[in-house]
């Protein structure tokens, strides 16, 4: 429920006002399809010329975008624990090391999402990074967003799989 409240706060309090201030543009962080380095540089130029949109984006980076990934990572971790990963894969028991790695996935999601937020806060106005830092951030941000969404999708698929398997074994 807390994650849903954060998502609603982000959408209603920041995404919609940003779209209004940016003539229909979306923040990079909410583009599910991802983005490229050129999109980052384009957004940087846009925000430098539009201080209202820059202030809204800075507000999300300074508040809910730092808390939401941590809350969602904790929720995913707890759901993974409740789903009790385990069982067999191709007739062999899943090794303990693999199960431990599965529990690391929600943590990796949280790190990637927080990394994207922190790097965005250091790149976009009111920050004034050097040209070298801008180039580096523009190249790293697309990698972080792809990592974030891939890990999130894999975690959700695994949660569904383990929940279905544990539910089926309880019925047997």
Each model region followed by its residue ranges:
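Interfacial segments of alpha-helical transmembrane regions
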Residues: 1-3, 91-108
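Hydrophobic core of alpha-helical transmembrane segments in multi-pass integral membrane proteins
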Residues: 1-13, 73-76, 153-160
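Interfacial loop at the N-terminal end of multi-pass membrane proteins
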Residues: 1-60, 128
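Juxtamembrane loop-transmembrane helix junctions in multi-pass integral membrane proteins
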Residues: 49-52, 56-59, 87-100, 129-143
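Hydrophobic alpha-helical transmembrane segments
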Residues: 59-81
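Alpha-helical transmembrane segments of integral membrane proteins
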Residues: 64-71, 99, 103, 145-152
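Alpha-helical transmembrane segments of multi-pass integral membrane proteins
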Residues: 105-160
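Short, charged juxtamembrane terminal tails flanking transmembrane helices
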Residues: 164-172
